[in-house]
Amino acid sequence: MKKIMITGALGQIGTELVVKCRTLYGNDNVLATDIREPEEGSALKNGPFEILDVTDKARMDELVESFKPDTMMHMAALLSATAEKNPLFAWDLNMGGLMNALEVAREYKLQFFTPSSIGAFGPSTPKVNTPQVTIQRPTSMYGVNKVAGELLCQYYFEKFGVDTRSVRFPGLISHIKEPGGGTTDYAVDIYFKAVREGQYSSFIAKDTFMDMMFMEDAINAIIQLMEADGVKLINRNAYNLSAMSIEPEMVKEAIQEYYPDFKLDYDVDPVRQSIADSWPNSIDVSCARAEWGFDPQYDLSAMTKVMLDAIEGKEKAEVK
């Protein structure tokens, strides 16, 4: 039975990852950590939780020594658009936190996961069916952090034998937590606005294709990768992942199947648009499929139904 410590547990991915891991491995076997306490009624209250600033190595050591995990899932990070507003802080948090977590994994012989991103690619990367191994010259601080992180994970595996594993996540779409500073967040916000207001003003331009995936598929991919036979993992430092390549008009049309009067217009944010323009339109996920069986279950249509149903349910519950 795995015993897992998760950093950044209150983030978009972390929240749902903690819930899934506790379901699989037991509430008491998953330590959730973040820089602040979870809200009252949070799903994270059903198991151990500790305050952790990932830039504080001594505190991280203390928690590992007391909880004695065999696995670290390092999810704490500043996202792409937020990182551009404060690049020095982004470097300190994203790289300092990762170095601390990797050192802990080395010192205590932990299996290690941290996510990379399609943000690790840049304008000179092939934009269509982007290969697993290709040019990576990102133009955002977040992307620079992710490329450095991929290389560090490979270094710690080759130099110290740390069982590091990672994936390049596309935009992740979830109804559990609302958007939090990412370039792909329009594809989450659009569903909430469709239910609440019947219209949405997109900060990403029409015909801007980006890879996306439903959060349930993303969480299952993490678990599947961490359970996979390490001998078969050739590209362990960061597997390309995606379930769909979409642009705002496609999401609008999917929503209009359920909300025929839904309206979409555009108020493009130049910062986030420039980041999106530097990313691929679609990526090749064949290595993840071949090496550990990646198989996402949700396409745009199936995801849209789940998103709208879940948000409608939340809205009705809040009215009561």
Swiss-Prot record:
**Could you tell me the Gene Ontology terms of the biological process aspect for this record?**
threonine catabolic process
Q: Which SUPFAM superfamilies match?
A: NAD(P)-binding Rossmann-fold domains
MF term (GO), any: L-threonine 3-dehydrogenase activity
Q: Which Gene3D superfamilies match?
A: NAD(P)-binding Rossmann-like Domain (3.40.50.720)
Q: Which family does it belong to?
A: Belongs to the NAD(P)-dependent epimerase/dehydratase family.
Can you say what this protein is called? Uncharacterized epimerase/dehydratase SSP2164
Q: Which organism does this record belong to?
A: Staphylococcus saprophyticus subsp. saprophyticus (strain ATCC 15305 / DSM 20229 / NCIMB 8711 / NCTC 7292 / S-41)
